[in-house]
Amino acid sequence: MKKIWFFLTILLAYFHGLSQNIIIDCITSKQASDCYSAIEINPVNKLLFNCSPQGFGSQLEIKNNSPKSIFFFEKEHNTIWLKFNCPYDALMCFDIIPIDTTYDFDFLLFKNEENDFCKNLNYNHEKPVRSNISRNNLKNKSITGLNINAKKKYIPSGIQPMYSKALKVNKSENYFLVIDNVYGGESGFSLQFSYYKEKNIKGKIMDKNTNSAIYSNIIIESANSGEQIAESQSDSVTGEFNLDYKAIINEDYYLITESKNYFFSETLINTISKTDTFSTNLEIKVPKLKKNENLKLHNLNFYGDSYEYLPTAIPSLNRLLSLMQNNSTLKILIEGHTNGCPGGIEYSQMLSEQRAKTIKDFLIKNGVKKQRLVSKGFNCSKMLYPNMETNSDWEKMMNRRVEILVLDF
Protein backbone atom coordinates (compact mmCIF):
# COMPACT_ATOMS: atom_id res chain seq x y z
CA MET A 1 0.00 0.00 0.00
CA LYS A 2 2.82 2.42 0.85
CA LYS A 3 4.42 1.83 -2.57
CA ILE A 4 1.07 2.42 -4.34
CA TRP A 5 0.50 5.66 -2.44
CA PHE A 6 4.03 6.85 -3.27
CA PHE A 7 3.46 6.16 -6.97
CA LEU A 8 0.14 8.05 -6.92
CA THR A 9 1.94 10.99 -5.30
CA ILE A 10 4.42 11.02 -8.17
CA LEU A 11 1.60 10.94 -10.74
CA LEU A 12 -0.14 13.88 -9.08
CA ALA A 13 3.10 15.85 -9.08
CA TYR A 14 3.53 15.06 -12.77
CA PHE A 15 0.16 16.53 -13.68
CA HIS A 16 0.93 19.68 -11.69
CA GLY A 17 3.80 20.44 -14.07
CA LEU A 18 6.86 18.86 -15.57
CA SER A 19 9.20 21.36 -13.97
CA GLN A 20 8.07 20.52 -10.43
CA ASN A 21 10.60 18.68 -8.28
CA ILE A 22 9.62 15.48 -6.49
CA ILE A 23 10.99 14.95 -2.98
CA ILE A 24 11.60 11.40 -1.73
CA ASP A 25 11.77 11.23 2.05
CA CYS A 26 14.33 9.31 4.08
CA ILE A 27 11.97 6.51 5.13
CA THR A 28 11.00 5.76 1.53
CA SER A 29 14.64 5.78 0.41
CA LYS A 30 15.77 3.41 3.16
CA GLN A 31 12.98 0.94 2.34
CA ALA A 32 14.16 0.56 -1.27
CA SER A 33 17.52 -1.18 -0.80
CA ASP A 34 16.35 -4.37 -2.53
CA CYS A 35 15.25 -5.02 -6.09
CA TYR A 36 11.85 -6.31 -4.92
CA SER A 37 11.17 -3.05 -3.05
CA ALA A 38 12.26 -0.71 -5.88
CA ILE A 39 10.55 2.69 -5.93
CA GLU A 40 8.54 3.30 -9.09
CA ILE A 41 9.42 6.79 -10.33
CA ASN A 42 8.38 9.16 -13.09
CA PRO A 43 11.64 9.75 -15.01
CA VAL A 44 10.70 13.23 -16.20
CA ASN A 45 10.81 15.40 -13.11
CA LYS A 46 13.86 16.16 -10.99
CA LEU A 47 13.91 13.75 -8.05
CA LEU A 48 15.33 14.99 -4.74
CA PHE A 49 16.34 12.27 -2.27
CA ASN A 50 16.60 13.70 1.25
CA CYS A 51 18.85 10.87 2.45
CA SER A 52 21.33 8.43 1.00
CA PRO A 53 20.53 4.71 1.15
CA GLN A 54 21.79 2.80 4.17
CA GLY A 55 23.01 -0.76 3.68
CA PHE A 56 22.08 -3.31 1.02
CA GLY A 57 18.68 -4.33 2.36
CA SER A 58 17.58 -7.85 3.21
CA GLN A 59 19.18 -9.40 0.11
CA LEU A 60 22.61 -8.91 -1.39
CA GLU A 61 21.55 -9.16 -5.03
CA ILE A 62 24.88 -8.03 -6.49
CA LYS A 63 27.91 -9.77 -4.97
CA ASN A 64 31.08 -11.79 -5.58
CA ASN A 65 32.11 -9.83 -8.67
CA SER A 66 35.63 -9.01 -9.79
CA PRO A 67 36.84 -5.54 -8.76
CA LYS A 68 37.84 -5.16 -12.43
CA SER A 69 34.34 -5.89 -13.77
CA ILE A 70 32.95 -3.31 -16.18
CA PHE A 71 29.39 -4.55 -15.63
CA PHE A 72 28.87 -4.92 -11.87
CA PHE A 73 29.81 -3.55 -8.47
CA GLU A 74 32.09 -5.93 -6.60
CA LYS A 75 29.15 -6.03 -4.18
CA GLU A 76 26.36 -3.75 -2.97
CA HIS A 77 27.23 -1.34 -0.15
CA ASN A 78 24.48 1.24 0.38
CA THR A 79 21.97 0.85 -2.42
CA ILE A 80 18.63 2.22 -3.57
CA TRP A 81 16.63 0.52 -6.33
CA LEU A 82 14.40 2.50 -8.71
CA LYS A 83 12.22 1.37 -11.60
CA PHE A 84 10.52 3.34 -14.34
CA ASN A 85 8.89 3.30 -17.76
CA CYS A 86 10.42 5.50 -20.47
CA PRO A 87 8.13 8.37 -21.53
CA TYR A 88 9.61 8.90 -25.02
CA ASP A 89 11.37 7.33 -27.97
CA ALA A 90 14.65 9.16 -27.46
CA LEU A 91 18.24 9.16 -26.26
CA MET A 92 18.05 9.04 -22.46
CA CYS A 93 20.50 10.79 -20.15
CA PHE A 94 20.51 11.41 -16.42
CA ASP A 95 22.62 13.06 -13.73
CA ILE A 96 23.16 11.70 -10.21
CA ILE A 97 24.26 14.70 -8.15
CA PRO A 98 25.35 14.17 -4.51
CA ILE A 99 24.64 16.90 -1.97
CA ASP A 100 27.96 16.07 -0.28
CA THR A 101 30.52 16.13 -3.09
CA THR A 102 32.86 13.77 -1.22
CA TYR A 103 30.39 10.91 -1.75
CA ASP A 104 31.17 8.26 -4.35
CA PHE A 105 28.02 7.14 -6.19
CA ASP A 106 28.08 4.23 -8.65
CA PHE A 107 25.15 2.93 -10.69
CA LEU A 108 23.94 0.03 -12.83
CA LEU A 109 21.06 0.36 -15.30
CA PHE A 110 19.13 -2.76 -16.34
CA LYS A 111 16.49 -3.20 -19.02
CA ASN A 112 13.57 -5.26 -17.73
CA GLU A 113 12.58 -7.62 -20.53
CA GLU A 114 11.09 -10.39 -18.38
CA ASN A 115 8.36 -10.61 -15.76
CA ASP A 116 10.59 -11.82 -12.95
CA PHE A 117 13.58 -9.50 -13.26
CA CYS A 118 14.58 -9.54 -9.59
CA LYS A 119 14.58 -13.33 -9.41
CA ASN A 120 16.70 -13.62 -12.54
CA LEU A 121 19.08 -11.02 -11.15
CA ASN A 122 19.72 -13.24 -8.12
CA TYR A 123 20.75 -16.02 -10.47
CA ASN A 124 23.10 -13.70 -12.41
CA HIS A 125 20.90 -13.93 -15.50
CA GLU A 126 20.71 -10.17 -16.00
CA LYS A 127 23.44 -7.92 -17.41
CA PRO A 128 23.17 -4.12 -17.20
CA VAL A 129 22.81 -2.03 -20.35
CA ARG A 130 24.88 0.72 -18.73
CA SER A 131 27.19 1.01 -15.71
CA ASN A 132 29.53 3.49 -14.10
CA ILE A 133 31.74 2.33 -11.23
CA SER A 134 34.39 5.03 -11.53
CA ARG A 135 35.97 6.84 -8.60
CA ASN A 136 34.24 10.11 -7.75
CA ASN A 137 35.81 13.27 -9.17
CA LEU A 138 35.70 16.20 -6.73
CA LYS A 139 36.56 18.66 -9.52
CA ASN A 140 33.27 17.72 -11.20
CA LYS A 141 31.28 17.71 -7.92
CA SER A 142 31.29 13.88 -7.96
CA ILE A 143 28.43 13.82 -10.49
CA THR A 144 27.83 10.65 -12.49
CA GLY A 145 25.20 9.39 -14.94
CA LEU A 146 24.53 9.09 -18.67
CA ASN A 147 25.62 11.87 -21.01
CA ILE A 148 25.04 12.65 -24.68
CA ASN A 149 28.77 13.22 -25.26
CA ALA A 150 30.08 10.15 -23.42
CA LYS A 151 31.63 7.38 -25.55
CA LYS A 152 31.59 4.19 -23.45
CA LYS A 153 28.62 2.12 -22.29
CA TYR A 154 30.44 0.65 -19.28
CA ILE A 155 32.91 2.44 -17.01
CA PRO A 156 34.97 0.31 -14.56
CA SER A 157 36.37 1.29 -11.17
CA GLY A 158 39.32 3.62 -10.74
CA ILE A 159 40.06 7.04 -12.23
CA GLN A 160 37.67 6.91 -15.17
CA PRO A 161 35.13 9.14 -16.99
CA MET A 162 32.28 10.40 -14.81
CA TYR A 163 29.62 9.66 -17.45
CA SER A 164 28.57 6.61 -19.44
CA LYS A 165 27.10 6.78 -22.93
CA ALA A 166 23.49 7.92 -23.47
CA LEU A 167 21.01 5.09 -24.06
CA LYS A 168 18.56 4.88 -26.96
CA VAL A 169 15.18 4.00 -25.44
CA ASN A 170 11.64 3.43 -26.66
CA LYS A 171 8.47 4.67 -25.05
CA SER A 172 7.09 2.34 -22.33
CA GLU A 173 10.26 0.26 -22.02
CA ASN A 174 10.85 -0.68 -18.39
CA TYR A 175 14.17 -0.20 -16.56
CA PHE A 176 15.70 -0.81 -13.14
CA LEU A 177 18.33 1.62 -11.82
CA VAL A 178 20.40 0.71 -8.77
CA ILE A 179 22.50 3.46 -7.17
CA ASP A 180 25.23 2.63 -4.65
CA ASN A 181 26.74 5.15 -2.21
CA VAL A 182 29.97 3.18 -1.86
CA TYR A 183 31.34 4.60 1.40
CA GLY A 184 28.04 5.61 2.98
CA GLY A 185 26.82 8.81 4.59
CA GLU A 186 23.51 10.47 5.45
CA SER A 187 23.34 13.30 2.89
CA GLY A 188 21.07 12.78 -0.08
CA PHE A 189 21.32 13.36 -3.80
CA SER A 190 19.28 14.43 -6.81
CA LEU A 191 18.44 12.53 -9.98
CA GLN A 192 17.61 14.49 -13.14
CA PHE A 193 16.57 12.86 -16.43
CA SER A 194 16.78 14.42 -19.89
CA TYR A 195 15.79 13.09 -23.31
CA TYR A 196 17.29 13.99 -26.68
CA LYS A 197 15.97 13.79 -30.24
CA GLU A 198 18.01 13.79 -33.43
CA LYS A 199 17.16 17.02 -35.26
CA ASN A 200 18.08 18.66 -38.54
CA ILE A 201 17.98 22.31 -39.48
CA LYS A 202 18.72 23.74 -42.89
CA GLY A 203 18.26 27.02 -44.66
CA LYS A 204 19.93 30.00 -46.25
CA ILE A 205 21.74 33.09 -44.91
CA MET A 206 21.20 36.27 -46.94
CA ASP A 207 21.87 39.99 -46.86
CA LYS A 208 18.79 41.76 -45.48
CA ASN A 209 18.70 44.38 -48.24
CA THR A 210 20.15 42.67 -51.33
CA ASN A 211 19.16 39.01 -50.70
CA SER A 212 22.69 38.00 -51.73
CA ALA A 213 24.20 34.90 -50.13
CA ILE A 214 26.38 35.32 -47.03
CA TYR A 215 29.12 33.05 -45.75
CA SER A 216 28.42 32.68 -42.04
CA ASN A 217 29.47 30.71 -39.00
CA ILE A 218 26.37 28.96 -37.62
CA ILE A 219 25.87 27.87 -34.01
CA ILE A 220 23.03 26.02 -32.29
CA GLU A 221 22.79 27.20 -28.69
CA SER A 222 20.56 26.24 -25.76
CA ALA A 223 18.13 29.05 -24.96
CA ASN A 224 18.20 28.04 -21.28
CA SER A 225 21.91 27.63 -20.58
CA GLY A 226 23.67 29.26 -23.52
CA GLU A 227 25.57 26.01 -24.09
CA GLN A 228 26.79 25.52 -27.65
CA ILE A 229 25.26 22.33 -29.08
CA ALA A 230 26.49 22.26 -32.68
CA GLU A 231 28.40 24.38 -35.18
CA SER A 232 28.70 24.61 -38.95
CA GLN A 233 29.16 27.14 -41.80
CA SER A 234 26.98 28.27 -44.68
CA ASP A 235 28.12 27.80 -48.27
CA SER A 236 30.11 30.83 -49.45
CA VAL A 237 28.36 30.84 -52.86
CA THR A 238 24.76 29.88 -52.06
CA GLY A 239 24.52 30.82 -48.37
CA GLU A 240 22.88 27.45 -47.71
CA PHE A 241 23.52 25.32 -44.63
CA ASN A 242 22.47 21.91 -43.33
CA LEU A 243 23.14 20.97 -39.71
CA ASP A 244 22.32 17.92 -37.57
CA TYR A 245 22.14 18.23 -33.81
CA LYS A 246 20.75 16.54 -30.71
CA ALA A 247 18.08 18.54 -28.88
CA ILE A 248 16.60 18.05 -25.42
CA ILE A 249 12.86 17.42 -25.58
CA ASN A 250 10.82 20.42 -24.32
CA GLU A 251 13.75 22.85 -24.56
CA ASP A 252 14.20 25.76 -26.95
CA TYR A 253 17.30 26.61 -28.95
CA TYR A 254 18.75 29.58 -30.81
CA LEU A 255 20.36 29.44 -34.22
CA ILE A 256 23.15 32.02 -34.20
CA THR A 257 24.83 33.45 -37.31
CA GLU A 258 28.12 35.38 -37.24
CA SER A 259 29.37 36.97 -40.48
CA LYS A 260 32.13 39.45 -41.30
CA ASN A 261 30.85 43.05 -41.65
CA TYR A 262 27.35 41.97 -40.52
CA PHE A 263 25.39 41.97 -37.30
CA PHE A 264 25.04 38.59 -35.66
CA SER A 265 21.53 37.11 -35.70
CA GLU A 266 19.64 35.05 -33.11
CA THR A 267 16.70 32.97 -34.37
CA LEU A 268 14.58 31.09 -31.85
CA ILE A 269 13.88 27.50 -32.84
CA ASN A 270 10.41 26.67 -31.55
CA THR A 271 9.89 24.36 -28.56
CA ILE A 272 11.24 20.93 -29.36
CA SER A 273 8.46 18.45 -30.07
CA LYS A 274 8.27 14.91 -28.70
CA THR A 275 7.75 13.46 -32.19
CA ASP A 276 10.27 11.70 -34.37
CA THR A 277 13.21 13.35 -36.11
CA PHE A 278 12.14 16.46 -37.96
CA SER A 279 13.75 19.09 -40.14
CA THR A 280 13.36 22.85 -39.95
CA ASN A 281 13.94 25.06 -42.99
CA LEU A 282 14.88 28.69 -42.32
CA GLU A 283 15.56 31.77 -44.40
CA ILE A 284 17.61 34.24 -42.36
CA LYS A 285 18.21 37.80 -43.51
CA VAL A 286 21.01 39.62 -41.70
CA PRO A 287 21.56 43.42 -41.64
CA LYS A 288 24.93 44.73 -42.73
CA LEU A 289 27.01 46.90 -40.42
CA LYS A 290 26.33 50.37 -41.80
CA LYS A 291 25.12 53.73 -40.53
CA ASN A 292 21.48 53.82 -39.32
CA GLU A 293 21.10 50.03 -39.48
CA ASN A 294 19.22 48.58 -36.51
CA LEU A 295 19.52 45.26 -34.65
CA LYS A 296 16.83 43.89 -32.35
CA LEU A 297 18.38 41.69 -29.66
CA HIS A 298 15.50 39.34 -28.86
CA ASN A 299 17.52 37.49 -26.24
CA LEU A 300 18.88 40.51 -24.35
CA ASN A 301 16.04 41.01 -21.88
CA PHE A 302 15.55 42.15 -18.28
CA TYR A 303 13.64 41.25 -15.15
CA GLY A 304 10.36 43.11 -14.77
CA ASP A 305 10.66 46.58 -13.20
CA SER A 306 14.45 46.18 -13.12
CA TYR A 307 17.57 47.05 -15.10
CA GLU A 308 19.18 43.71 -14.19
CA TYR A 309 19.43 41.56 -17.29
CA LEU A 310 18.32 37.93 -17.29
CA PRO A 311 20.98 35.18 -17.09
CA THR A 312 19.88 34.04 -20.56
CA ALA A 313 21.06 37.42 -21.92
CA ILE A 314 24.74 36.70 -21.19
CA PRO A 315 25.49 34.87 -24.49
CA SER A 316 24.00 37.80 -26.45
CA LEU A 317 26.02 40.26 -24.39
CA ASN A 318 29.20 38.36 -25.16
CA ARG A 319 28.34 38.31 -28.87
CA LEU A 320 27.79 42.07 -28.79
CA LEU A 321 31.15 42.47 -27.07
CA SER A 322 32.86 40.34 -29.75
CA LEU A 323 31.16 42.41 -32.45
CA MET A 324 32.61 45.60 -30.96
CA GLN A 325 36.05 44.03 -30.48
CA ASN A 326 36.20 42.70 -34.05
CA ASN A 327 35.06 45.97 -35.63
CA SER A 328 37.18 48.71 -34.10
CA THR A 329 35.51 51.56 -36.05
CA LEU A 330 31.97 50.57 -35.09
CA LYS A 331 30.07 53.15 -33.03
CA ILE A 332 26.61 52.29 -31.69
CA LEU A 333 23.57 53.69 -29.91
CA ILE A 334 22.18 51.37 -27.23
CA GLU A 335 18.41 51.85 -26.95
CA GLY A 336 16.60 50.85 -23.75
CA HIS A 337 12.89 49.89 -23.71
CA THR A 338 10.20 48.98 -21.16
CA ASN A 339 7.05 46.87 -21.08
CA GLY A 340 4.41 49.58 -20.75
CA CYS A 341 4.50 52.59 -18.44
CA PRO A 342 2.58 51.38 -15.35
CA GLY A 343 4.62 53.67 -13.09
CA GLY A 344 4.23 56.65 -15.40
CA ILE A 345 6.28 58.00 -18.31
CA GLU A 346 8.91 59.57 -16.06
CA TYR A 347 9.63 56.32 -14.20
CA SER A 348 9.59 54.31 -17.43
CA GLN A 349 12.03 56.77 -19.00
CA MET A 350 14.43 56.39 -16.09
CA LEU A 351 14.17 52.58 -16.20
CA SER A 352 14.78 52.42 -19.96
CA GLU A 353 17.82 54.69 -19.61
CA GLN A 354 19.22 52.48 -16.84
CA ARG A 355 18.77 49.38 -18.99
CA ALA A 356 20.68 50.95 -21.86
CA LYS A 357 23.38 52.17 -19.47
CA THR A 358 23.75 48.68 -17.97
CA ILE A 359 24.72 47.31 -21.38
CA LYS A 360 27.00 50.27 -22.05
CA ASP A 361 28.77 49.74 -18.70
CA PHE A 362 29.25 46.03 -19.47
CA LEU A 363 30.98 46.85 -22.76
CA ILE A 364 33.18 49.55 -21.20
CA LYS A 365 34.15 47.22 -18.35
CA ASN A 366 35.29 44.68 -20.96
CA GLY A 367 37.53 47.08 -22.86
CA VAL A 368 35.31 48.90 -25.37
CA LYS A 369 36.12 52.63 -25.47
CA LYS A 370 33.28 54.75 -24.12
CA GLN A 371 33.62 57.14 -27.09
CA ARG A 372 32.17 54.37 -29.28
CA LEU A 373 29.04 53.96 -27.15
CA VAL A 374 25.93 56.10 -26.66
CA SER A 375 22.98 55.00 -24.53
CA LYS A 376 19.42 56.32 -24.61
CA GLY A 377 16.07 55.35 -23.09
CA PHE A 378 12.79 55.27 -25.03
CA ASN A 379 10.40 54.44 -22.12
CA CYS A 380 7.39 52.50 -23.46
CA SER A 381 7.13 54.41 -26.74
CA LYS A 382 8.48 51.60 -28.96
CA MET A 383 6.99 48.40 -27.58
CA LEU A 384 7.16 45.42 -29.92
CA TYR A 385 3.89 44.18 -28.40
CA PRO A 386 1.81 47.20 -27.32
CA ASN A 387 -1.39 45.36 -26.29
CA MET A 388 -0.75 45.24 -22.55
CA GLU A 389 -4.05 43.53 -21.68
CA THR A 390 -3.46 40.42 -23.78
CA ASN A 391 0.34 40.17 -23.89
CA SER A 392 1.81 36.79 -22.96
CA ASP A 393 4.74 36.51 -20.55
CA TRP A 394 7.03 36.01 -23.54
CA GLU A 395 5.71 39.16 -25.26
CA LYS A 396 6.18 41.16 -22.06
CA MET A 397 9.77 39.91 -21.85
CA MET A 398 10.38 40.93 -25.48
CA ASN A 399 9.25 44.47 -24.62
CA ARG A 400 11.86 44.64 -21.81
CA ARG A 401 14.83 44.83 -24.14
CA VAL A 402 17.61 46.83 -25.73
CA GLU A 403 18.22 47.45 -29.43
CA ILE A 404 21.37 48.53 -31.25
CA LEU A 405 21.60 51.30 -33.85
CA VAL A 406 24.78 51.84 -35.90
CA LEU A 407 25.94 55.45 -35.59
CA ASP A 408 29.07 55.04 -37.64
CA PHE A 409 31.10 52.28 -39.33
Predicted regions and their residues:
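Acidic, Ser/Thr/Pro-rich low-complexity intrinsically disordered segments
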Residues: Q20-Q31, L60-N174, D180-G185, S194-K197, ...
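A short, Gly/Thr-enriched small/hydrophobic beta-strand-prone motif that recurs across taxa
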Residues: L91-C93, Y195-K208, N294-N299
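Structural motif
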Residues: K204-S216, E221-A223
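Short, acidic Ser/Thr/Gly-rich low-complexity loop/linker segments typical of extracellular
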Residues: N224-N242
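A short, solvent-exposed loop/turn motif at the edges and junctions
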Residues: Y245-I272
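Extracellular beta-sheet/turn segments enriched in Thr/Pro/Gly and aliphatic residues
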Residues: T267-N294, H298
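Periplasmic peptidoglycan-binding/anchoring modules of Gram-negative envelope and division proteins
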Residues: F302-G336, I364, I404-F409
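Periplasmic OmpA-like peptidoglycan-binding domain that tethers envelope proteins to the cell wall
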Residues: H337-F409
